[in-house]
């Protein structure tokens, strides 16, 4: 997933030598359950230090868990692992299978990082 800034005038916000970036994106067209949905920030040399919270699609049907898959040192690679999500009855999650296309969904998330 490539994150695009919500409002270029407002983001990224500098906090010390790091930046807070709020953006939106669409999950990948062909999800890979093993590697997840690799996350990057568009238009900047931006390395992600942390992703704040879970990622939920705007229609509430999918929930994503951000994971540092390339280690925890500087410039770690982050991926989102997607699950179907239901609030009816007993809330439940089920892993999205490989090859599933959820690219029509949209989500918003916040990352901290910098160049």
Language-model features and meaning:
Residues 28-96, 101:
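Extracellular attachment/recognition segments
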Residues 1-37, 103-115:
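Extracellular receptor-binding modules and their adjoining Ser/Thr/Gly/Asp/Asn-rich linkers
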